[in-house]
Design a protein with these regions (language model features):
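Extended, helix-rich architectural segments
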Residues: 1-162
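Extended, charged amphipathic alpha-helical segments
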Residues: 233-390
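Short, compositionally biased low-complexity segments
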Residues: 87-91, 104, 218-239, 338-347
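C-terminal helix-loop subdomains that flank or include functional centers
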Residues: 369-386, 390, 400-443
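Extended, regular secondary-structure scaffolds
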Residues: 109, 113-253
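Short, charge-rich amphipathic segments
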Residues: 3-23, 34-69, 288-312, 328-356, ...
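Intrinsically disordered, low-complexity boundary segments flanking structured domains
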Residues: 75-79, 88, 121-133, 139, ...
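Non-transmembrane, amphipathic alpha-helical segments
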Residues: 355, 359-362, 366, 395, ...
Length: 443
């Protein structure tokens, strides 16, 4: 669909895909939160806030404050995700991989072989940039573009991954929802690019974000828009424009894994720093100038009245109130037993409260269970490299088929992306001299 200028102006005023684009951006931020090894909350502020707000609703205020003190980058979840992707990376080392290209002239085949290696950095680009984009930007878009000025005998098309947050609006192709009829996205220097099935245009915008002038226009004879979604696997039937990478379905489990990992750290503090308790001694704090004195950790004035602060709370004793916070390494004073009935209290006057072993074991086991569940769900049955339990031949076959199914899904996505890029580049560079191609990443 070739867009007219007035259509582009209307789209800029009222883009139809704004909500879908924002959903994709938010989902990718959650992926980054659990995938990338960040060192500061500023790198991924929004998903961090969402996670901590969720935890805040689960815990009492004092426990949440402790959780915040223990929450620190880098997080433990990227290590789990890294283990998952280390298993899935085998998709690049499959057997019997092959690719073939047909041209009307054999010399063009040699030219293409050199061009895709030297100019497109294939096949390495799929193992590096493509692999990373799959992990954190499955909603990114593959764009095949042309330089504004042709400097050689043949056109020199190139491709890149366009982040979804740079997109203004788009319309997908009716017969293939991964390809576009047209695409409009932001460019540097307050410009926009418009891709459709007849041309590639760049417009300059004014301060009001209105089209000011046409910067460049490159006509093409592709018959389709030279852009498509990088990843083909849809999130679900209702959200076909949102793409699902291998760990998308495990984002909630990753949240829980992070929660229990940090909760375990809290429990771990009680091992080297248990809570000590002993019979309380009367606090003898007294302010000689004002007459204020301590009564049970709070202040009374010279008249015996509690001292009320501006916020309505009773003022705490500056000497002993901090001793009453129960945390790792705290010292608590407990009331002296009442011996009015003449019964002697035989308890140890100084006691140590250690961590409850069952609570610690539960957190340790739950972390291990969640990690194993995440790995198996993404990688396939028998997700770990080593198996402690003996398994029979049928189980071995089932595990192999489970893993193979996962790798085949990855393989298909990369094959479709690579074929689109290479076919489009070949058509732009060689025109009708390019016949067809075949891309197979093997088994």
């Amino acid at each position: 669909m070739a867009l007219e200028l007035n259509q582009i102006k209307q789209i800029l005023q009222k883009p139809t895909k704004r909500q879908t684009i924002q959903k994709a951006v938010n989902m990718q931020r959650r992926l980054r939160f659990h995938t990338e090894t960040n060192v500061a909350v500023s790198d991924i502020n929004q998903p961090t806030t969402i996670f901590l707000d969720w935890v805040r609703r689960l815990l009492p205020k004092d426990k949440f404050n402790i959780f915040l003190h223990l929450f620190k980058f880098p997080l433990p979840t990227p290590a789990v995700v890294e283990d998952v992707y280390r298993e899935l990376e085998r998709v690049f080392y499959s057997r019997n991989s092959s690719s073939s290209y047909q041209f009307t002239d054999s010399e063009l085949a040699e030219d293409w072989s050199q061009y895709k290696k030297n100019n497109l950095n294939e096949p390495e680009v799929w193992k590096t940039t493509g692999w990373k984009r799959m992990q954190v930007s499955p909603n990114s878009i593959l764009v095949v573009d042309l330089p504004q000025v042709q400097t050689s005998l043949r056109p020199e098309p190139y491709f890149y991954w366009l982040e979804i947050d740079a997109v203004i609006d788009y319309q997908t192709f009716r017969l293939d929802e991964n390809q576009f009829e047209w695409l409009i996205f932001k460019q540097p220097e307050h410009r926009i690019a418009v891709f459709d099935d007849t041309s590639i245009r760049v417009y300059q915008l004014n301060e009001k974000n209105e089209i000011q002038s046409l910067i460049s226009e490159a006509k093409h004879d592709l018959g389709y828009c030279p852009a498509r979604f990088f990843w083909s696997t849809q999130l679900n039937e209702k959200n076909k424009d949102l793409k699902k990478n291998p760990i998308t379905k495990e984002l909630s489990n990753l949240d829980w894994y992070l929660f229990f990992s940090i909760s375990k750290q809290h429990l771990d503090l009680y091992a080297p720093y248990p809570i000590y308790s002993a019979y309380e001694a009367d606090c003898n704090f007294e302010n000689n100038e004002t007459g204020d004195y301590c009564d049970g950790g709070f202040l009374r004035n010279a008249k015996g009245e509690y001292k009320i602060l501006n916020d309505g709370t009773v003022e705490k004793c500056p000497c002993c109130s901090e001793k009453r916070i129960a945390g790792p390494g705290s010292f608590l004073e407990v009331p002296i037993p009442n011996q009015s009935e003449g019964v002697a209290d035989m308890r140890n006057p100084v006691q140590i409260t250690t961590i409850d072993k069952d609570s610690l074991d539960y957190n340790v086991n739950e972390c291990a269970r969640l990690k194993n569940e995440i790995v198996i769900s993404v990688v396939g049955s028998g997700g770990t490299v080593s198996e402690k339990e003996a398994i029979n031949e049928t189980q071995v076959t089932a595990n192999f088929e489970s893993k193979t199914s996962v790798l085949n899904a990855l393989k298909t996505n990369f094959e479709l992306a690579q074929k689109f890029v290479e076919d489009t580049v070949c058509k732009l560079r060689y025109g009708g001299a390019f016949i067809s191609s075949s891309v197979n990443w093997g088994t």
